[in-house]
């Protein structure tokens, strides 16, 4: 019986997944019981819901059922507090006071974070009961760096939970001394100057107020090698170093999320937090600006905004504060010609991913590939690039001065080398849900066909689909005049981007033209040498009107609506505007003027231009440790720098390393639970230093696998786990045979950028129709039987579409697993696949690096794009959105057979990015709440577009918009999710970002600035200055400092903070090597100065570079010893 609301078809889908999981689990369990692995059972517990995940990750035992009851009755946060209370009361076993308090805090935090992230395990080091100076006992929570993965709200709630536990244990409040209070302030300042900045910069007094009033001690482990200088050696603070975890919980938790804490405190009736109200009132506006960016829309007049009103949108410059070399700026903040804001969701957008016309992806020299991350001005901080070809594409000026609207990929490829300037970048498609999630003001919508169609529908006017999508120019004028409706968006130009006086100048030039009957165009005289004509021609470009320049003539083929917009009646061949000068004087602005002279209403084409710059390039690559290895079998330094065990065997080398081992009764040293020499069952006693019998184990492994000779096999130097238990060498040999690599936990992974998709066409995923039917895809979105590869199907929530390169890698992984089953466990092969399509239907795990819980997925196809397509729910189940982050896929059977907790590093954060528990069925209620804000409509209502002109908060129109939240606990939560904009191919556009294909940094920056130069919305001089200031200068200074403070290393692996007095390695006697080279220090010097000169950077930047140059020269150039000639002495 499933615990989720689902239709019969979805229930069957989930049952199929559960059956397949069980089959794989049983197969792996049988292999484990053979005794050849670290344990005799599969080490990944299965979880059907959040409660199971919590119990599986942090415990205590038998807590899952109670969590379900409490969450059902109370909700998540109250349930977390109640479960913490019951734990300290001993309802789940007797614990010591400190152990019970720690268990309570961990379990409560796990409930709050849905049992997915690693914070409850790794983010809380421990909980102690300590004493105040008056003898009273209080609770201290020791936070660690991985608490960051919980997010600010959960960090704050962890402190709140600690206070609740303290009260239920009858403990006193924490009473800090003045030195302890000031220590926090010193650490916060030091952290921001030496480590990194916080999202919120608190004032010293805010820190004092918080520390004095929080009833538990927020403390933690040392996380950074930076020590305080003032408030040192305090009795109750164990370290003089920065406590990064504690600072995160205090600053980005309690202080930043004060309003949210207050809401929970009031809702739950917890006392002792009233002091937060004072903090909230002092900083609420600043918090909203940082957290919500909700105060950017300002009006010059108090009346509602209309297309005639002047208005001002405050540019958000934060995204462009730092520009990385080689990664272009596509549009400066709110700059004219930038990305035009358009509302809606395509089947491959939403959940922080925005749509762009694929044509612009080619025209910016391939710097926007499918999956490339952009840092954006609004509504969020970042997005992921995906193609949507039903929105407006770019408008460009060619080298021959013609202006062309690029509305197809074919045109983009045809003209890409002839583009002189990109006048308009085209649309950015953003869904309402992203504004709701960021609590960002709903900004005015651009004038688009979907809004236009809603107006026609509301007035019960007749029209055809062809008229909406591609109308005839004469038809739209007649229709607008006849029906008294606004001019069609296709022929509505950017009149608002030039002044009304400029419009009048342009009008006079255009009306002075003549009709060319031979080619049905409107001709204008054009002399490029005439400055006045060049200026007015520029106005024509700036309104985005397509035209062709031929033989010193400008020819306009879409002349009919243009002439009527300017008050010229083409049919009557006369100017119908009277008193034009009076109209210029009496109109408020450009839009008012154009509407006064036109015979129909002309809407404002664009209200909002969105700025953006490139973030990270897309990624699709196998996960490798540094350096890449095939197995977790340690060989110390025997394999030299290349770590090849076969080389060590050939050269007869070995090494002494610390490893778990036991002396077997047969006389041999066994490193495994089953002695490879006699087959006896043994139990390694624990780690100790031994001389590793590499040769014996190598040949025994080859014999066991019946392999005569193996190729190169890379191994690790040593284990970092607690017990130092190793993986069988046979697995490393078989991985090397199949050209795959191992991760720290024994699994083999593939990383790719997260991209959402709710619907797909079989042709996009190389899908076979019959195979898709066997996987449950029987009908398309219109209810028609699946018959051809171009039908649109709704994606099931746990199905994934992997990159082509991932499919190839998984082919190798499947062959490795089959070899392992056959040659090592002596069982039948399982996958038996030889081509990509044969992997369709097999199960994988999806997992994010900051979590400790995996999600079962099913491969249904592959695409050429270097991204991992999955349902937004699937990404949300990993506590991810889709703003450019990357996560891992790995085969489920690989994880069941090869994962072990005992391989994980014994250090803080070692259990992150490991599948400590596996969710088998996706429940939308238990995923990251951000996806609940994603809209699920097939169309936006007319009221939405009208309300957008008022600049209202997104919550104010929530009642007219359907989101995923409205579907929860209904069968429709899994099916029937809509989208507003179609796209032909989800992987249309460049597949590899140019940043990855260019070579040197000089090439990258040259290409970056070439893009900036041809985009109207970008200032290349500002880009050059920002690259130098935010990237090159800090890097040059940092490397210069690192060179002077560097240690040395030896080829044997030894490292020294300072050069030994002997000048050679104390371990092996070899020559020592610098860790920072001269080249590393100088690498950006020449390119920085070249850019500064070429783009005329400010004198300040040039002088700063000169100072850095002199610093480098003083370090590497000996100015006291100079080569001279003998004749110099006779001068």
Curated annotation (Swiss-Prot):
It comes from the Archaea. Pfam families: PolC_DP2_cat, PolC_DP2_central, PolC_DP2_N. One of its GO terms (biological process) is DNA-templated DNA replication. Its EC number is 2.7.7.7, 3.1.11.1. GO terms for molecular function: DNA binding; DNA-directed DNA polymerase activity; single-stranded DNA 3'-5' DNA exonuclease activity. It catalyses: DNA(n) + a 2'-deoxyribonucleoside 5'-triphosphate = DNA(n+1) + diphosphate; Exonucleolytic cleavage in the 3'- to 5'-direction to yield nucleoside 5'-phosphates. Keywords: DNA replication, DNA-binding, DNA-directed DNA polymerase, Exonuclease, Hydrolase, Multifunctional enzyme, Nuclease, Nucleotidyltransferase, Transferase. Heterodimer of a large subunit and a small subunit. Possesses two activities: a DNA synthesis (polymerase) and an exonucleolytic activity that degrades single-stranded DNA in the 3'- to 5'-direction. Has a template-primer preference which is characteristic of a replicative DNA polymerase. Belongs to the archaeal DNA polymerase II family. NCBIfam families: polC, PRK04023.1. This is DNA polymerase II large subunit. It comes from Methanococcus maripaludis (strain C5 / ATCC BAA-1333). The lineage of its organism: Archaea, Methanobacteriati, Methanobacteriota, Methanomada group, Methanococci. The gene is polC.
């Amino acid at each position: 019986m499933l615990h989720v609301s689902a239709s019969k078809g979805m229930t069957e889908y989930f049952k199929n997944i559960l059956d397949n999981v069980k089959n794989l689990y049983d197969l792996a369990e049988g292999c484990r019981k053979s005794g050849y692995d670290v344990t005799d059972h599969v080490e990944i517990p299965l979880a059907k819901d959040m409660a199971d995940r919590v119990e599986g990750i942090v415990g205590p035992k038998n807590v899952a059922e109670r969590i379900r009851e409490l969450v059902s009755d109370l909700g998540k946060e109250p349930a977390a507090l109640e479960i913490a209370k019951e734990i300290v009361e001993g309802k789940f076993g007797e614990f010591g006071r400190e152990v019970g308090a720690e268990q309570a805090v961990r379990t409560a935090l796990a409930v709050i974070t849905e049992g997915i992230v690693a914070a409850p395990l790794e983010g809380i080091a421990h909980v102690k009961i300590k004493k105040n100076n008056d003898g009273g006992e209080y609770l201290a929570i020791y936070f660690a760096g991985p608490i960051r993965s919980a997010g600010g709200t959960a960090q704050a709630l962890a402190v709140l939970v600690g206070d609740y536990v303290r009260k239920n244990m009858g403990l006193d409040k924490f009473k800090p001394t003045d030195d302890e209070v000031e220590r926090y302030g010193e650490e916060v300042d030091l952290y921001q100057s030496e480590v990194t900045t916080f999202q919120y910069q608190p004032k010293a007094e805010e820190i004092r107020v918080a520390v004095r009033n929080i009833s538990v001690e927020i403390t933690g482990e040392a996380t950074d090698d930076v020590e305080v200088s003032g408030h040192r050696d305090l009795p109750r603070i164990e370290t003089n170093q920065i406590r990064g975890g504690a600072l995160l919980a205090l600053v980005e938790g309690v202080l930043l999320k004060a309003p949210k804490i207050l809401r929970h405190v009031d809702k739950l009736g917890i006392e002792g937090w009233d002091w937060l109200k004072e903090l909230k009132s002092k900083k609420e506006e600043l918090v909203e600006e940082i957290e919500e960016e909700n105060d950017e829309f300002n009006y010059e007049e108090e009346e509602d905004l209309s297309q005639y009103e002047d208005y001002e949108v405050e540019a958000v410059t934060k995204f462009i504060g730092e520009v990385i070399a080689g990664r272009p700026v596509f549009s400066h903040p709110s700059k004219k010609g930038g990305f035009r804001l358009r509302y809606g969701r395509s089947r491959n957008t939403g959940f922080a991913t925005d749509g762009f016309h694929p044509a612009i992806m080619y025209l910016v020299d391939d710097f926007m590939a499918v999956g490339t991350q952009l840092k954006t001005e609004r509504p969020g901080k970042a997005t992921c690039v995906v193609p949507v070809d039903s929105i407006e594409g770019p408008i460009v000026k060619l080298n021959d001065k013609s202006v062309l609207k690029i509305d197809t990929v074919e045109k983009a490829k045809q003209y890409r080398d002839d583009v002189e300037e990109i006048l308009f970048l085209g649309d950015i498609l953003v869904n309402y849900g992203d504004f709701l999630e960021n609590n960002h003001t709903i900004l005015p919508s651009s004038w688009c066909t979907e809004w236009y169609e809603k107006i026609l529908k509301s007035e019960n006017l007749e029209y055809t689909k062809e008229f909406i999508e591609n109308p005839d120019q004469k038809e739209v004028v007649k229709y607008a005049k006849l029906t008294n409706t606004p001019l069609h968006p296709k022929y509505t130009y950017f009149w608002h981007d030039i002044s009304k006086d400029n419009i009048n100048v342009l009008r006079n030039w255009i009306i002075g033209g003549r009709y060319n009957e031979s080619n049905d165009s409107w001709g204008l005289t054009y002399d490029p040498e005439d400055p006045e004509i060049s200026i007015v021609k520029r106005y024509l470009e700036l309104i985005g009107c397509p035209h062709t320049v031929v033989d010193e003539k400008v020819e306009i083929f879409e002349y009919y609506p243009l002439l009527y917009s300017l008050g010229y009646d083409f049919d009557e061949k006369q100017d119908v505007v009277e008193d034009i000068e009076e109209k210029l004087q009496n109109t408020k602005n450009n839009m008012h003027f154009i509407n006064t002279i036109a015979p129909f209403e002309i809407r404002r084409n664009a209200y909002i231009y969105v700025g953006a710059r490139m973030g990270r390039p897309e990624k699709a690559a196998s996960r490798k440790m540094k350096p890449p290895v095939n197995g977790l079998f340690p060989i110390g330094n025997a394999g030299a720098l290349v770590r090849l065990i076969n080389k060590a065997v050939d050269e007869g080398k070995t090494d002494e390393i610390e490893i778990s081992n036991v002396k077997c009764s047969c006389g041999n040293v066994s490193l495994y639970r089953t002695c490879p020499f006699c087959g006896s069952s043994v139990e390694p006693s624990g780690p100790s230093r031994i001389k590793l019998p590499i040769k014996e184990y190598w040949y025994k492994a080859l014999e066991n696998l019946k392999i005569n000779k193996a190729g190169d096999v890379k191994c690790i130097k040593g284990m970092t786990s607690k017990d130092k238990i190793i993986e069988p060498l046979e697995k490393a040999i078989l991985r090397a045979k199949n050209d795959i690599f191992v991760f720290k936990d024994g699994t083999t992974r593939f990383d790719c950028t997260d991209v959402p998709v709710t619907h797909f066409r079989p042709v996009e995923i190389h899908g076979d129709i019959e195979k898709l039917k066997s996987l449950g895809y029987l009908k398309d979105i219109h209810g028609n039987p699946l018959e051809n590869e171009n039908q649109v199907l709704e994606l099931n929530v746990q199905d994934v579409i992997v990159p082509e390169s991932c499919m190839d890698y998984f082919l190798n992984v499947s062959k490795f697993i089959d070899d392992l089953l056959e040659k090592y466990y002596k069982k039948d092969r399982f996958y038996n696949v030889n081509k990509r399509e044969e992997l369709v239907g097999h199960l994988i795990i999806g997992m994010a690096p900051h979590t400790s819980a995996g999600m079962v997925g099913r491969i249904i196809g592959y695409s050429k794009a270097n991204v991992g397509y999955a349902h937004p729910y699937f990404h949300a189940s990993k506590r991810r959105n889709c703003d450019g982050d990357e996560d891992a896929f790995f085969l489920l059977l690989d994880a069941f057979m090869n994962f072990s907790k005992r391989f994980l590093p014994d250090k803080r954060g070692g259990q992150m990015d490991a599948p400590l528990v596996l969710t088998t069925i996706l429940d939308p209620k238990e995923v990251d709440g951000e996806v609940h804000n994603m809209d699920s409509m097939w169309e936006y209502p007319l009221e939405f577009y009208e309300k957008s002109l008022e600049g209202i908060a997104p919550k104010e129109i929530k009642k007219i918009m359907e989101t995923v939240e409205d579907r929860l606990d209904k069968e429709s939560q899994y099916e029937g999710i809509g989208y507003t904009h179609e796209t032909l191919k989800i992987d249309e556009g460049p597949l590899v970002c140019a940043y990855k294909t260019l070579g040197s940094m000089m090439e990258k920056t040259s290409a970056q600035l070439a893009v900036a130069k041809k985009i109207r919305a970008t200032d290349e001089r500002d880009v050059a200055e920002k690259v130098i200031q935010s990237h090159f200068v800090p890097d040059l200074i940092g490397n210069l400092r690192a060179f002077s403070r560097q240690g040395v290393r030896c080829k044997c692996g030894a490292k020294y903070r300072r050069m030994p007095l002997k000048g050679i390695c104390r371990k092996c006697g070899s020559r020592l090597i610098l860790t920072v080279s001269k080249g590393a220090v100088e690498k950006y010097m020449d390119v920085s100065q070249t850019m500064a000169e070429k783009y005329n950077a400010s004198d300040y930047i040039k002088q700063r570079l000169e100072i850095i140059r002199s610093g480098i020269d003083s370090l590497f150039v000996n100015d006291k010893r100079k080569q001279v000639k003998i004749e110099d002495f006779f001068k």
